[in-house]
């Protein structure tokens, strides 16, 4: 007989014999089939997340808060950065803010709001989505004006 792939067989006793579990006492693995006493794990088992009667994790953790779908997250620009990057009598637009790396391009998703951190001495015209009350007062005190988009 020639040695070919379809003729190959393992050496005798090199592989353990298969046990067909739960097929009677004579087969050696009958009745409880190696599963021990007849409990929950002998059967189908339990669903994912089941903790044996203990209150499961997803119910122990409280239900806290929610995400408001109407919440608007602004890109913040402070007066101090406008003071540094703009000269007198300039107009602050969304394009100029982007060119000076003060905002990201995603203006549709995150509108721009100017806040009053720092001091403003230059006369500027702001064309942005929103301005805080203190920032509006500081701009108007410096002789500038605010145009909300």
Curated annotation (Swiss-Prot):
Belongs to the universal ribosomal protein uL15 family. GO terms for cellular component: cytosolic large ribosomal subunit. GO terms for molecular function: rRNA binding; structural constituent of ribosome. Residues 17-28 have a biased composition (Basic residues). The gene is rplO. It comes from the Bacteria. InterPro entries: Ribosomal_uL15 (IPR030878), Ribosomal_uL15/eL18 (IPR021131), Ribosomal_uL15/eL18_sf (IPR036227), Ribosomal_uL15_bac-type (IPR005749), Ribosomal_uL15_CS (IPR001196). One of its GO terms (biological process) is translation. Residues 1-54 are annotated as: Disordered. Binds to the 23S rRNA. This is Large ribosomal subunit protein uL15. Part of the 50S ribosomal subunit. Keywords: Ribonucleoprotein, Ribosomal protein, RNA-binding, rRNA-binding. It comes from Mycoplasmopsis synoviae (strain 53).
């Amino acid at each position: 007989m020639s040695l070919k792939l379809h003729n190959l067989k393992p050496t005798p006793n090199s592989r353990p014999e298969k046990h067909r579990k739960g097929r009677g006492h004579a087969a050696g693995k009958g009745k409880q089939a190696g599963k021990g006493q007849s409990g929950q794990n002998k059967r189908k088992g339990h669903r994912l997340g089941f903790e044996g009667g203990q209150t499961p994790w997803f119910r122990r953790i409280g239900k806290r808060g929610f995400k408001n779908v109407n919440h608007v997250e602004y890109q913040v620009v402070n007066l101090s950065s406008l003071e540094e990057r703009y000269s007198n009598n300039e107009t602050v637009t969304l394009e100029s803010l982007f060119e000076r790396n003060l905002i990201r391009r995603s203006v549709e998703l995150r509108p721009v709001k100017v806040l009053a951190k720092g001091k403003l001495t230059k006369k500027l015209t702001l064309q942005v989505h929103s301005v805080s009350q203190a920032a509006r007062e500081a701009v108007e005190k410096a002789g500038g004006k605010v145009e909300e988009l």
